[in-house]
Curated annotation (Swiss-Prot):
Pathway: Amino-acid biosynthesis; L-histidine biosynthesis; L-histidine from 5-phospho-alpha-D-ribose 1-diphosphate: step 1/9
Keyword vocabulary terms for this entry: Amino-acid biosynthesis, ATP-binding, Cytoplasm, Glycosyltransferase, Histidine biosynthesis, Nucleotide-binding, Transferase
Subunit structure: Heteromultimer composed of HisG and HisZ subunits.
Disulfide bonds: none
Name of the coding gene: hisG
Free-text function comment from the UniProt entry: Catalyzes the condensation of ATP and 5-phosphoribose 1-diphosphate to form N'-(5'-phosphoribosyl)-ATP (PR-ATP). Has a crucial role in the pathway because the rate of histidine biosynthesis seems to be controlled primarily by regulation of HisG enzymatic activity.
Cellular component, GO annotation: cytoplasm
Gene3D superfamilies, per database record: Periplasmic binding protein-like II
GO BP, one annotated term: L-histidine biosynthetic process
PANTHER family: ATP PHOSPHORIBOSYLTRANSFERASE (PTHR21403:SF8), ATP PHOSPHORIBOSYLTRANSFERASE ATP-PRTASE (PTHR21403)
InterPro entries (alphabetical): ATP_PRibTrfase_cat, ATP_PRibTrfase_CS, ATP_PRibTrfase_HisG, ATP_PRibTrfase_HisG_short
Official protein name in the record: ATP phosphoribosyltransferase
Length: 231
């Protein structure tokens, strides 16, 4: 029975993933046609490569339609309800670093922690006649962090379809939850990250579908990739 490994289909994530695999001794033979999203690995007839977007990889792992995949931890945890029951992180790959953070306008000088934000959220409806609005593409992670971890209930998530960091200035939200690598875009939009507002420190990971997690072949591939990372 063959194992399907899903890889990012383009950009630096694809390049860095192929380099990690080669370091582990897996030489991916790319197709001649760029529209062909399947590839093979030299000398590994039972290992199939499938190229997908990082978000598609997270979803397909959750469905169990691929055995292994390389995607961001943020995407796995945001895309999949009860992610730990559906997938397992086999290795952190050391690239694609980014943090999912809670950011508020710099002019909110008295708001530096989630506890401060809880006070603001409770007071916001009375003062403004509406709930605090949070723009984000990460509604699942936001709900878990606000409601379950910090007990903040009085807020409303505004789906972000464009540049999330611009939502407060545009008036469509009061604050944001977004992903950032350097923080420069947040600063350019006069936003600040709360002191305890890092929801997740994400990076590219090798992830297995839970249904495949105990497969001897999947374990062997994951172990070989982990060993390659230590070279």
């Amino acid at each position: 029975m063959s194992v399907t490994l899903a890889l990012p289909s383009k950009g630096r994530l694809k390049e860095k993933t192929l380099a990690v695999l080669e370091k582990a001794g897996y030489k991916v033979v790319l197709p001649d046609d760029d529209r062909n999203y399947r590839a093979r690995v030299e000398g590994e007839d039972d290992l199939d490569i499938l190229f997908l977007s990082a978000s598609e990889i997270a979803r397909e792992l959750g469905y169990g339609s691929v055995d292994l995949g390389v995607t961001g931890e943020d995407l796995a945890r945001e895309t999949l309800a009860h992610a730990d029951e559906r997938v397992a992180i086999e290795a952190q790959l050391g690239f694609g670093h980014a943090d999912v953070v809670v950011a508020v306008p710099e002019v909110w000088r008295d708001v530096t922690t989630m506890a401060d934000l809880d006070d603001v959220a409770a007071d916001f409806r009375q003062r403004h006649g509406r709930r605090l609005r949070i723009a984000t593409k990460y509604w699942r992670l936001t709900q878990q962090f606000f409601s379950q971890k910090h007990g903040i209930q009085v807020y409303r998530i505004v789906e972000s379809l464009g540049a999330t960091e611009g939502a407060p200035a545009a008036g469509s939200a009061d604050m944001i939850v977004d992903i950032t690598s350097t923080g420069s875009t947040l600063r350019a939009n006069r936003l600040k990250v709360l002191e305890d507002g890092i929801i997740l420190r994400s990076q590219a990971c090798l992830v297995s579908a839970r249904r495949s997690h105990t497969s001897r072949r999947v374990e062997e591939i994951a172990a070989r990739i982990r060993a390659g990372l230590e070279i």
